[in-house]
Amino acid sequence: MIKVIGIGPGGKEDMTPRALNAILEADTVAGYNTYIKLIKHLLDGKNVIGTGMMQEVDRCKMAIEEAVKGHNVAVVSSGDSGVYGMAGLVLELLLKLPKEERPQVQIVAGLSAVNAAA
């Protein structure tokens, strides 16, 4: 299973309970290093895949590899994972796999910055 999770605009108070639970249930968490730092208090005992800016494709490929192996994987994005987040890229990469090899995927929406500002 791979879950693509929006963690909100940065503060833990802006993360939805669903996003929090999805991260806690994961055994592997992948994300941009800055976002990993924002949730480091949730990552004890987890395999962490952190990469820098401009390494989104590599990060998603590594996360998908872990999910294919049977791991419960969370890919975190700031804001909402579907709005300038990682959901589109993860889905695009999954479509390149043979259908029988694709792990289940779930998109966990988060609070986008535009909604937080309202």
Positions of the model-derived regions?
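Class I S-adenosyl-L-methionine
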Residues: 1-108, 112, 116
